[in-house]
Amino acid sequence: MAARKATQTPRERRVTKVLDAAQELFATRGYEATLVAEIAESASVAPATIYNYFSTKPNLLMELALRHVRAALPERRAFLKNLPENPLQGIEAFERLLAEQALRHLSRECWRTMMAAQIVEPRGRAARTGARLNDLIKRQYVQIIRTYQARGRLVADVDASTLSDLVVGVATMNFARFVCGPSGTIEDLLRIGLPHIALILRGLLLDKQSRPRRRIRME
């Protein structure tokens, strides 16, 4: 981290300071209660600098989310290289990892704000950033699905991209329901979403010893 900061340009260093300050204040005071002026004071920059770099407070929050996703990529890559043998268990474990990463640094309030910003300004920066985050997860799911197809554990004639869109769409809906609720744990989120994942995969799972087209009946 120190080496990376040493190679940053002055602008990049200011952006890092702003994001660090915002993360700390959002965690301790909450997103809505934190003013841009307070972030600027903590980061030792002018409020105008923050507006110049991010335009809006929601955009700053989206950039913070992007930074956390970039930091989380090595953990996801390690998981994708060592998937569980059972596809349902693998996807459930990946959903748990995504949930843990999402809530590790950003609160439910922050996630609600980001989702709302994408709806309010569908062509805005927040919406574009949200689409990038979603596309990344979809690509990772495509990799998971194709890996299980290559292992003979998922039917081969299902389009991996389409199945990925379905899984991510349902998971995103459930995450939105979760963060909009007054309280709850990651276990509560998984309790809501995992039955839907199991239903999506019904009839697509193959027994380890089966021929490629034989499907498991899920009770």
Segments (PLM) and residue ranges:
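Helix-turn-helix
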Residues: 17, 21, 25-59, 63, ...
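Amphipathic alpha-helical packing segments from all-alpha helical-bundle domains
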Residues: 73, 85, 89, 105, ...
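Helical hydrophobic small-molecule/effector-binding pocket
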Residues: 88-124, 142, 168, 172, ...
